[in-house]
A protein has these predicted regions:
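Assembly/interface hotspot detector across virion components, adhesins/toxins, and nucleic-acid enzymes
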Residues: 21-27
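Glycine-rich phosphate- or other oxyanion-binding loops that anchor nucleotides, phosphorylated ligands
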Residues: 3, 27-239
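Short, conserved "active-site rim" segments that organize catalytic pockets and cofactor/ligand binding
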Residues: 2-21, 41, 87
């Protein structure tokens, strides 16, 4: 029985955790998904964005029927005090698109799910509008899937970009399945040497964040394995 399901966006975010897990591939709605399994935990990398996360969460629930689903991955800081590598487990998740929110049983602060990679200017607005400390793209969608299927829900995120970090729009580097187009990104940045310092910083931040995230996930898995309590979605408020 798989007790814990984890939905991440990209494998590079969780590679240190799943490098020695067994792998199972399934075709779901015309897409090949890879599920990483170990003991009573299953993890899937569904892709970037809300739609990719929703499909991945629904697939995990349909195939494995875990009792709790976690949204895990990278997040941007909305507060200057949050630094790269800090793990964030919010008490509330807000969907910036429709204003709906889910209150969790465990955690601290607010995470807002936004429709794109937020620029420094957008981060400032999100902080004011939602009183959030961090921003991601997938957690609200995973929470909605968990709620619809009666599964518990939790969030483990790590700061990968700080409050003042900004980069040209990343939308062009994400395909319709939520996969990051690495070659296109490499060509884009190779032809723009003024971006190289930011690219180097982004790579360092991502590596540091991935290690911290996987550390946090290991602790979460151990805690759940030792407990009979399952995090659940609390009151879900819709506008």
């Amino acid at each position: 029985m798989f007790r814990v399901g984890i939905v991440a966006a990209l494998k590079r975010e969780v590679r240190p955790l799943v490098k020695d897990w067994s792998v199972r591939e399934e075709e779901v709605d015309g897409r090949r998904l890879r599920f990483f399994e170990k003991d009573n935990v299953v993890l899937v990398c569904g892709g970037i964005g809300a739609e990719a996360a929703r499909r991945a969460a629904e697939a995990v629930i349909a195939i494995y029927a875990p009792t709790v689903i976690y949204s895990a991955g990278f997040a941007g800081a909305l507060e200057p005090t949050l630094k790269v590598g800090e793990v964030v487990q919010p008490l509330r998740v807000v969907n910036a698109g429709d204003g709906s929110s889910a209150n969790l049983e465990q955690g601290e602060g607010v995470l807002v799910s936004f429709g794109s990679v937020a620029s420094a200017e957008q981060k400032a607005k999100l902080r004011v509008s939602f009183g959030a400390q961090a921003v991601d793209m997938e957690a609200a969608a995973v929470g909605r899937a968990a709620e619809a299927r009666g599964a518990g829900f939790g969030v483990v995120k790590v700061i990968s970009d700080e409050f003042d970090f900004s980069f040209p729009s990343m939308e062009r580097f994400v395909d319709s399945n939520g996969q990051f187009l690495e070659r296109r990104f490499a060509w884009f940045t190779a032809l723009r040497p003024w971006l190289w310092p930011q690219v180097a910083r982004l790579a360092r931040n991502s590596n540091r964040a991935a290690l911290a995230l996987c550390d946090g996930l290991r602790k979460m898995i151990r805690a759940i394995s030792a407990s009979s309590d399952i995090p659940s979605v609390g009151a879900v408020n819709r506008r």
